[in-house]
From Swiss-Prot:
Family: Belongs to the PRA-PH family.
The keyword Amino-acid biosynthesis appears for this protein: yes
Organism: Lactiplantibacillus plantarum (strain ATCC BAA-793 / NCIMB 8826 / WCFS1) (Lactobacillus plantarum)
GO CC terms in record: cytoplasm
Name used for this protein in its record: Phosphoribosyl-ATP pyrophosphatase
Record's catalysed reaction(s): 1-(5-phospho-beta-D-ribosyl)-ATP + H2O = 1-(5-phospho-beta-D-ribosyl)-5'-AMP + diphosphate + H(+)
Pfam families: PRA-PH
Pathway connected to this protein: Amino-acid biosynthesis; L-histidine biosynthesis; L-histidine from 5-phospho-alpha-D-ribose 1-diphosphate: step 2/9
Signal peptide: none
Enzyme Commission number(s) of this protein: 3.6.1.31
Principal subcellular localization: cytoplasm
Record-linked CDD domains: NTP-PPase_HisIE_like
Name of the gene encoding the protein in the UniProt record: hisE
PANTHER family reported in the protein's UniProt record: HISTIDINE BIOSYNTHESIS BIFUNCTIONAL PROTEIN, HISTIDINE BIOSYNTHESIS BIFUNCTIONAL PROTEIN HISIE
InterPro entries in the cross-refs: HisE, PRib-ATP_PPHydrolase-like
């Protein structure tokens, strides 16, 4: 695997032709709620890792989060092209972050 799009395609293939006993198959078998729970857990782990010194833990946890987000996209039928198109629409645009409420408790 070389990039995120290839990983997405591999996950999509695994959903279409499950490899029994694999973690990916386990997630798809358990369904959307389990996948969402994992995305939430991994997001929290990325936040904690980012607060710690060093990059190894952050790198590891970010890889986990990206994998689980890709599983979520496949489960929901959202194509990688849809994500790329959305990112392309945003390229060069100014953010409206000032209009968003501030997060006070993190």
């Amino acid at each position: 695997m070389q990039n995120m799009e290839e990983l997405y395609e591999l996950i999509k293939q695994r959903k279409a032709t499950p490899k029994k006993g694999s973690y990916t198959d386990y997630l798809f078998t358990k369904g959307l709620d389990k996948i969402l729970k994992k995305v939430g857990e991994e997001s929290t782990e990325v936040i904690v890792a980012a607060k710690n010194p060093g990059d190894d833990e952050l790198t590891y946890e970010t890889a986990d989060l990206l994998y689980h987000v890709l599983v979520l996209l496949v489960e929901r039928g959202v194509s990688f092209d849809q994500i790329k198109q959305e990112l392309a629409k945003r390229e060069g645009k100014m953010s409206d972050y000032k209009d968003r409420p501030e997060i006070k408790n993190l």
